[in-house]
Amino acid sequence: MAKGRVAERSQLGAHHTTPVGDGAAGTRGLAAPGSRDHQKEKSWVEAGSARMSLLILVSIFLSAAFVMFLVYKNFPQLSEEERVNMKVPRDMDDAKALGKVLSKYKDTFYVQVLVAYFATYIFLQTFAIPGSIFLSILSGFLYPFPLALFLVCLCSGLGASFCYMLSYLVGRPVVYKYLTEKAVKWSQQVERHREHLINYIIFLRITPFLPNWFINITSPVINVPLKVFFIGTFLGVAPPSFVAIKAGTTLYQLTTAGEAVSWNSIFILMILAVLSILPAIFQKKLKQKFE
């Protein structure tokens, strides 16, 4: 079991160093691997690493929340009812209420509304907080289609990349402790598609095979390059966002987020998913043929 665990961490690209030195602690030497003292030392190190990671994560979250507070304070003066509706939408009713407020101020305070939308979307994506699907729908209600699509793709790409960097900085203990088995399996898939990684990321973003939050937090651990990750995400979220944005043009006719997706749109998404992975398949077949 221990050997399997070591192998899994090796596949995930984990690197561990053991400090060696003199002094009071050095007089008794390092504990032998597998001994009770060694297990205690390992537990202390892991516990300290987890606490430090949590402290850094909380600090970053509070800093981001403060930025969101400043964005909100820079918003125009709102009535009591409007302030109540200025929240991250959890259902379609919340989205409609928020859309009503934003559309009222969008023309007069265009930059403030755009910055608030941009910052909120990235905040949700960075910390894997649910609600971005409703913001995608709202973009179709608030802005022309080309701008809405670019805005959603950019926010998704940046937010996911910030989540990637956050995981790279403090998320490794979480991945190692809770997601090791799944991350190892995905690491094997990534290695299999290493030559066509952008196509593979696009495919994953279009299809529902892996949750977006899982892709975001495990990618740095299994050595997916950030540039490839961003480009694949930016392009991969476009087809699903297209569906959500088009639904936003009829926002007040929707009662649930599920109504934004029709069987026709699902069929189109599946076709686009297949097309995204075809170049990799064809190149692999040609390579095998010539070899």
Curated annotation (Swiss-Prot):
What UniProt keywords apply to this chain's record, in alphabetical order?
Autophagy, Cytoplasm, Endoplasmic reticulum, Host-virus interaction, Lipid transport, Membrane, Neurogenesis, Phosphoprotein, Transmembrane, Transmembrane helix, Transport
| A GO term from the CC aspect | mitochondria-associated endoplasmic reticulum membrane contact site
Spans annotated as VTT domain: 140-251
Q: Which GO terms describe its biological process?
A: autophagosome assembly; intracellular lipid transport; modulation by host of viral RNA genome replication; nervous system development
The record's GO molecular-function terms, alphabetically, read: phospholipid scramblase activity
Q: Indicate how the chain sits in the lipid bilayer.
A: Multi-pass membrane protein
Q: List Phosphothreonine occurrences by residue.
A: T18
- Give the location in the cell: Endoplasmic reticulum membrane; Endomembrane system; Cytoplasm
Which domain of life, per UniProt? Eukaryota
The UniProt catalytic activity note for this protein reads: a 1,2-diacyl-sn-glycero-3-phospho-L-serine(in) = a 1,2-diacyl-sn-glycero-3-phospho-L-serine(out); cholesterol(in) = cholesterol(out); a 1,2-diacyl-sn-glycero-3-phosphocholine(in) = a 1,2-diacyl-sn-glycero-3-phosphocholine(out); a 1,2-diacyl-sn-glycero-3-phosphoethanolamine(in) = a 1,2-diacyl-sn-glycero-3-phosphoethanolamine(out)
Give the residue ranges for region: Disordered.
1-39
- Just give the chief location class: endoplasmic reticulum
Phosphoserine-modified residues are S35
Q: Which InterPro entries match?
A: TM41A/B, VTT_dom
Q: Which residues cross the membrane?
A: 52-72, 109-129, 147-169, 197-217, 225-245, 262-282
The protein's job, in short, is: Phospholipid scramblase involved in lipid homeostasis and membrane dynamics processes. Has phospholipid scramblase activity toward cholesterol and phosphatidylserine, as well as phosphatidylethanolamine and phosphatidylcholine. Required for autophagosome formation: participates in early stages of autophagosome biogenesis at the endoplasmic reticulum (ER) membrane by reequilibrating the leaflets of the ER as lipids are extracted by ATG2 (ATG2A or ATG2B) to mediate autophagosome assembly.
- Assembly notes: Interacts with VMP1. Interacts with COPA, COPB1, VDAC1 and ERLIN2. Interacts with ATG2A. Interacts with SURF4. (Microbial infection) Interacts with Zika virus NS4A protein and Yellow fever virus NS4B protein.
As for family, the record states: Belongs to the TMEM41 family.
Task: Quote the record's domain comment.
Answer: The VTT domain was previously called the SNARE-assoc domain. As there is no evidence that this domain associates with SNARE proteins, it was renamed as VMP1, TMEM41, and TVP38 (VTT) domain. (Microbial infection) VTT domain is required for flavivirus infection.
Q: What is this protein called?
A: Transmembrane protein 41B
Organism this protein belongs to? Homo sapiens (Human)
Primary gene name: TMEM41B
